[in-house]
């Protein structure tokens, strides 16, 4: 038995993170503290100053754990990661972990490429973004590609020139200057990259002036073809500027403007992204579990969770209200960025007006979201209420688990479990099972096996649904009885056209009305569990089909196998390859080339 009062006496005064747990050992809250002793004790002292949310949490605390850190900054980083991992019930939690694309210019290469990426690496390349509008990113990349003939391949240029590799089609259709041929200098190629970087850096007007000067100069010197090239670039640049520009701001800094609206147990945070003095995008985020948490606490939670996931940190955060832990958050953001980051709360002027505009957008979105969410809630909870009534359940089936067995031509049986919590897919709870004890195609015994294995772990569901009829239900019913478990159990059966028809148990059969929310809900569960099983089965089958004799060679993994097959086209060509030819393959060293060469020579002997 965990004695809370005794453990409170043993708390250290150092900074760290504490984890509150309920009687099921679930983490229900994660927090950080400068002094663990002072902070954790506050929860168990007089509750008169506690919010209703904290009072509710304290009632459910069965025990607590803590992790000591060297500093408050380390505690903040650990807190962010633990909240992301466990999504505790009483923390304010960001509903979606959104990541955004960047445009990467591979300036760490002699002949750079332009790519769309999701991660920013410390690789000496240049990154631009993040961009919230993916369509705009794709349009920008397409315009760059159509305007500038830069390479898109990963080929080693020096090796291609040395081996006189045949250039790809892009050279012949004027989509690439063809640096792999050795006919374009780094300086000539670099001029194109400089223009692209100017455009992506927000210096479009300066680039426009430069291109117009070059066009006029070419025209005056009767180089009309060259002038036409500059004219086309200017036209593309004007189109790009039109797509990227939304509005101008009072500063040319990179800034994020953050404001919030709240209602009931949810809050909406709206962020406007400003890059080089222009609003390049906006995004909304829904926070759950806010209840009666102070605004300063909610905004602080958002900043921690959102920027913990972002690769790019702006120079300045403009926030509508003061937030908790402002100074330590500035320190953390600065350490992530590698230079000073400032959090500002404007009191007047244009920045204050900008924050107000962002807040109005947050209010408008939350109103729409709340109406939409209310309709969804009524639809989903309505289906659960109907399910409770029609199956004569004692309580609402908050957690529903559905099972299916998949095999192809009677072999490699796979079991799958999907989970619905409050009528929503709970994908982190999905599980797959390889059948261990059943030989051959036997859906009944296979279904019994996976449910038996499932019952050995975790909290039990309120309702079990099987993709099948009376046979599957009877087999699993025996498993429940052997495990001394009483869980409502029903099969989901289909009609002659293989469409969901109704629910069945040992004693009765219920045909569902196709016009109801309940029918649509059950049909979606049956389709989900079936697809989950089939998808996994396909991946196993594809993996088996791609197995090759190359898998038996020491040092050859998926990456090198792919490189070998791309280079030589088939295994027969690899068998005949010389050591010199093997060493030309990407990612190949002498030791691995020896292994490949000797493997096929031994095979011949």
UniProtKB/Swiss-Prot annotation:
Stretches assigned to the UVR domain: 205-240
Any GO CC annotation of this UniProt entry: cytoplasm
Gene3D superfamilies linked to this entry: 5' to 3' exonuclease, C-terminal subdomain (1.10.150.20), GIY-YIG endonuclease (3.40.1440.10), UVR domain (4.10.860.10), UvrC, RNAse H endonuclease domain (3.30.420.340)
Primary subcellular site in the record, as a coarse category: cytoplasm
Keywords: Cytoplasm, DNA damage, DNA excision, DNA repair, Excision nuclease, SOS response
Cellular localization per UniProt: Cytoplasm
Superkingdom, natural source: Bacteria
Example of a GO MF term: DNA binding
Family matches, as Pfam families: GIY-YIG, HHH_2, UVR, UvrC_RNaseH, UvrC_RNaseH_dom
Entries under InterPro entries matching the protein: DisA/LigA_HHH, GIY-YIG_endonuc, GIY-YIG_endonuc_sf, GIY-YIG_UvrC_Cho, Hlx-hairpin-Hlx_DNA-bd_motif, RuvA_2-like, UVR_dom, UVR_dom_sf
PROSITE patterns found in the cross-reference section: GIY_YIG, UVR, UVRC
GO biological process: nucleotide-excision repair; SOS response
Family stated for the protein in its record: Belongs to the UvrC family.
Assembly description: Interacts with UvrB in an incision complex.
Role: The UvrABC repair system catalyzes the recognition and processing of DNA lesions. UvrC both incises the 5' and 3' sides of the lesion. The N-terminal half is responsible for the 3' incision and the C-terminal half is responsible for the 5' incision.
Name of protein: UvrABC system protein C
Organism: Clostridioides difficile (strain 630) (Peptoclostridium difficile)
């Amino acid at each position: 038995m965990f004695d809370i009062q005794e453990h409170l006496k043993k708390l250290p005064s150092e900074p760290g993170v504490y984890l509150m747990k309920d009687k099921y050992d679930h983490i229900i809250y994660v927090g950080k503290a400068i002094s663990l002793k002072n902070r954790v004790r506050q929860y168990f002292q007089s509750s008169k100053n506690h919010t209703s949310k904290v009072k509710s949490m304290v009632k459910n605390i069965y025990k607590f754990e803590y992790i000591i850190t060297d500093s408050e900054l380390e505690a903040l980083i650990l807190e962010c990661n633990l909240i992301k991992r466990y999504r505790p019930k009483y923390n304010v939690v960001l509903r979606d972990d959104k990541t955004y694309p960047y445009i990467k210019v591979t300036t760490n290469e002699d002949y750079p490429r332009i790519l769309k990426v999701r991660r920013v690496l410390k690789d000496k390349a240049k990154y631009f973004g993040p961009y919230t509008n993916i369509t705009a990113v794709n349009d920008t990349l397409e315009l760059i590609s159509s305007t500038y003939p830069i390479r898109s391949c990963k080929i080693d240029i020096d090796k291609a020139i040395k081996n006189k590799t045949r250039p790809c089609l892009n050279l012949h259709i004027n989509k690439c200057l063809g640096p792999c041929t050795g006919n374009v200098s780094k300086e000539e190629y670099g001029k194109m990259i400089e223009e692209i970087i100017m455009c992506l850096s927000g210096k479009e007007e300066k680039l426009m002036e430069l291109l117009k000067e070059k066009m006029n100069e070419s025209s005056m010197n009767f180089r009309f073809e060259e002038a036409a090239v500059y004219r086309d670039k200017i036209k593309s640049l004007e189109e790009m500027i039109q797509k990227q520009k939304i509005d101008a701001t009072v500063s040319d800094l990179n800034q994020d403007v953050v404001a919030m609206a709240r209602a009931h147990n949810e809050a909406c945070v709206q962020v406007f992204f400003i890059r080089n003095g222009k609003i390049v995008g906006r995004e909304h985020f829904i926070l759950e579990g806010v209840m009666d948490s102070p605004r300063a606490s909610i905004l602080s939670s958002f900043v921690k969770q959102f920027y913990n996931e972002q690769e790019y940190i702006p120079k300045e955060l403009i926030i509508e209200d003061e937030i908790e832990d402002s100074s330590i958050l500035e320190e953390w953001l600065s350490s992530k960025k590698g230079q000073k980051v400032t959090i500002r709360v404007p009191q007047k002027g244009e920045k204050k007006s900008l924050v107000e505009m962002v807040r109005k957008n947050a209010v408008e979105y939350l109103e729409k979201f709340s109406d939409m969410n209310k309709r969804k809630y009524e639809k989903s909870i309505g289906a659960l209420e109907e399910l409770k009534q029609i199956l004569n359940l004692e309580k609402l089936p908050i957690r529903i688990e559905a099972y299916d067995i998949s095999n192809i031509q009677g072999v490699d049986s796979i079991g799958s479990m999907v989970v619905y919590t409050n009528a929503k897919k709970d994908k982190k709870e999905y599980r797959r099972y390889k059948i261990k004890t059943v030989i051959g195609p036997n859906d009944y015994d296979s279904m019994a096996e996976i449910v038996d294995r499932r019952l050995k772990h975790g909290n039990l569901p309120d309702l079990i649904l099987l993709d099948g009829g009376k046979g599957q239900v009877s087999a699993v019913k025996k498993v429940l009885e052997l495990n001394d478990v009483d869980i409502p159990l029903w099969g989901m059966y289909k009609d002659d056209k293989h469409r969901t028809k109704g629910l069945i148990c040992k004693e009765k059969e219920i045909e569902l009305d196709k016009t109801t929310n309940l029918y649509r809900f059950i049909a979606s569960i049956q389709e989900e569990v079936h697809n989950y099983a089939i998808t996994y089965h396909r991946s196993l089958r594809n993996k088996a089909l791609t197995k090759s004799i190359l898998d038996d060679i020491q040092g050859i993994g998926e990456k090198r196998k792919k490189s070998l097959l791309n280079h030589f086209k088939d295994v027969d060509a690899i068998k005949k390859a010389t050591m010199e030819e093997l060493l030309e393959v990407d990612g190949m060293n002498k030791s691995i080339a020896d292994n490949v060469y000797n493997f096929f020579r031994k095979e011949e002997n």
